[in-house]
């Protein structure tokens, strides 16, 4: 009799491998093939002085301002926030103009926010390079994304506070509170840049030194064999 006939007659003899054993064998094979990969930190930096990221912070409806136009230095991590009533191109034109006139950026990097794209000519007229990150590539926007998360974290109740997180003042950021947050952030030591954002913002030599260190590290990382993961690597 064939195996099929045996099965038809109700042959319940055990299979060579049970589903559980097959899965264990597969997992074992995976672990055998898996190669340990060292962790490498790839810093986002600019080899130009005075370059910035910018984005919009949603301050929720029925609050003043409705949005915050956030800027943060690519290298020095110095942060600026300007109040914004809406996301219209004309309103963003005003905050961009204010920022450009005061800080004279060499380059501004952002996502594809329509109000930013509508103001390309403003940047051109002021000799500001515009870099747009497409397809929501938030890895390239990590600096500004991380800072916006930091703002939210700084606007929460501390463990020692008697206040509650649902209280009105913790649901949005008022101009007074934003000023306090920025002052604290800009004057706190950052291990990434080995100084405070305010110090590097005030001293271009510190930024130049930081750029040189990042460039040197980047060149050394390029010589690492397993820096670029092959297709199929476990991460």
Q: Language-model segments: what does each one mean?
A:
Residues 2-153, 191-235:
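Retroviral integrase
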Residues 136-137, 147-183, 196:
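Globin-like tetrapyrrole-binding proteins
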């Amino acid at each position: 009799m064939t195996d099929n006939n045996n099965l038809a007659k109700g042959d319940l003899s055990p299979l060579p491998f049970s589903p559980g054993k097959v899965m264990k064998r597969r997992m074992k094979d995976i672990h055998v093939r898996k190669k340990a990969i060292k962790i490498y930190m790839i810093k986002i930096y600019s080899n130009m002085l005075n370059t910035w990221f910018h984005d919009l912070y949603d301050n929720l409806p029925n609050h003043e301002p409705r949005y915050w136009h956030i800027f943060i230095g690519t290298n020095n991590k110095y942060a600026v926030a300007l109040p914004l009533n809406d996301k219209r191109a004309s309103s963003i034109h005003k905050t961009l103009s204010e920022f450009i006139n005061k800080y004279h950026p060499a380059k501004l990097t952002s996502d594809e926010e329509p109000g930013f794209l509508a103001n390309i000519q403003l940047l051109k007229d002021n000799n500001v390079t515009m870099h747009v990150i497409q397809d929501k590539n938030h890895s390239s926007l990590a600096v500004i994304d991380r800072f916006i998360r930091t703002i939210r974290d700084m606007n929460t109740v501390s463990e020692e506070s008697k206040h509650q997180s649902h209280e009105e003042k913790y649901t949005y950021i008022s101009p007074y509170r934003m000023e306090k947050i920025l002052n604290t952030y800009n004057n706190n030591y950052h291990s990434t840049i080995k100084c405070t954002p305010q110090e590097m913002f005030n001293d271009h030599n510190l930024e130049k030194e930081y750029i040189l260190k990042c460039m040197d590290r980047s060149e050394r990382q390029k010589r690492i064999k397993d820096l670029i993961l092959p297709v199929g690597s476990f991460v």
